[in-house]
């Protein structure tokens, strides 16, 4: 994808902020990714979710204030982010509302809370907030976050009709020069909104439009999470593929051979001067 040109002065501010912070060491990455609090099942998905390469691409640093949007009931990325920033940074997890009318959301929130409570040495400093627009959108103090990250959630926000609210909330909490990192199942470029909502795949054009409407600049993209075996067209949408495998045993080996979905990885910046 051809990226829009970012003004040199603005881009240098984003880069300068990243280079001035202490980096996560290779030893720390290895320690976190192989830690006992990560289940074997979750670690087995590293080959598809590429947490090391993805978080390095987004520029996550140990002293960052990070907001993770909708970590879900399992908190897959929370397992990695929490220990990375625990020493001198801060992690906010903007979760589903516990008073949601949607049973899935309230159940996932309860599962996530139990996960945090069960491992205080890992998650004791994590601050749990609520993201359920339009009722809840105060996900962290305004202008305090270095990074806001979301993994495979945009299709859910589109379906709920709250995508614009979420991107606005992300913009609000970021510092000037802060980074919004988005990983999402990637649809064909010409996919309609109806197809995106039903399939779980979203076009890059759609994500970029949402981010830019909120005030963000597209800084970079990566193929870290791409999967050329995935043609984006399956009977049960993205949930046909692992780990969901919605068709059960039907064509199971076929979909296991494809692997997890083809995903975009986009990095946006909040301008220093709005």
Residue ranges and their predicted role:
Residues 29-57, 61:
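Class I SAM-dependent methyltransferase Rossmann-like catalytic core
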Residues 63-73:
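Conserved class I S-adenosyl-L-methionine
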Residues 82-83, 163-176:
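A short glycine-rich, Lys/Arg-flanked "PGG" loop and its adjoining helix->strand segment in the class I
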Residues 92, 177-185:
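Conserved beta-strand signature within the Rossmann-like core of class I S-adenosyl-L-methionine
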Residues 105-136:
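S-adenosyl-L-methionine
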Residues 138-148:
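A short acidic, Gly/Pro-enriched loop at the edge of an enzyme's catalytic core
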Residues 193-219:
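Conserved Class I S-adenosyl-L-methionine
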Residues 255-274:
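C-terminal lobe and adjacent flexible extensions of AdoMet/dcAdoMet transferase-like proteins
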